[in-house]
A protein has these predicted regions:
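NAD(P)+-binding Rossmann beta1-loop-alpha1 motif at the extreme N-terminus of oxidoreductases
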Residues: 1-61, 128-129
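Short alpha-helical
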Residues: 12, 39-40, 73-74, 100, ...
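Non-catalytic structural scaffold of enzyme domains
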Residues: 19, 42-47, 65, 104-107, ...
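Hydrophobic/aromatic beta-strand patches that form the interior of the parallel beta-sheet core
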Residues: 32, 53, 94, 116-118, ...
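Rossmann-fold NAD(P) dinucleotide-binding segment
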Residues: 54-109
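Internal alpha-helical scaffold of NAD(P)-dependent oxidoreductase catalytic cores
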Residues: 104-114, 130-158
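Active-site capping/gating segments
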Residues: 116-132
């Protein structure tokens, strides 16, 4: 996969996805991570040998795919920050945030975007998860394939 991925949020689930991708030989130079919490940022950078920043916009501009791994209570604010850029670049949007629908995410980012909503489970942290994926009507077959490849790094996909 020759896709650049912007991880907006670098918590445990993002870490497991990134770790799985690296184990599969994914080019780490195509992984861009933003994480607001300094101790998590430092740990992620050291553990996975990645540059991790505290700048969602910088990361978003580097990614063809935006993977949102932020707490649900901050999702709307994060989307507001990135809305203009999302509309200008039309990235594939993937979210693992609990309780946020694909329709909400699309609306918060300005609409008419390809959005995949993923429900990973806890065993994904060990690479043994089962991930349920839902794609809205704007997600094409190539984008579905990308989303499936990303989450196969943590287990099964349906």
């Amino acid at each position: 996969m020759n896709t650049s991925i912007a991880f907006i949020g670098g918590g445990n689930m993002a870490r497991s996805i990134i770790g799985g991708l690296l184990k599969q030989g994914f080019d780490r130079s195509r992984l861009h991570v933003s994480e607001p919490y300094e101790p998590t940022r430092t740990a992620l950078a050291e553990e996975l040998s990645l540059q991790v920043v505290n700048d969602n916009m910088q990361v978003a501009l580097a990614g063809q795919v935006w993977l949102f791994a932020v707490k649900p209570q901050v999702m709307k604010a994060v989307c507001a920050e990135l809305r203009e850029t999302a509309q200008a670049h039309k990235p594939l949007i993937i979210s693992i945030a609990a309780g946020i629908t694909a329709a909400q995410l699309d609306a918060w980012l300005g609409g008419n975007l390809p959005v995949v909503r993923v429900m990973p489970n806890t065993p994904a942290l060990l690479g043994a998860g089962a991930n349920g994926l839902y794609a809205n009507v704007r997600v094409d077959s190539g984008q579905k394939h990308i989303a499936e490849q990303l989450f196969r790094a943590t287990g099964l996909c349906t």
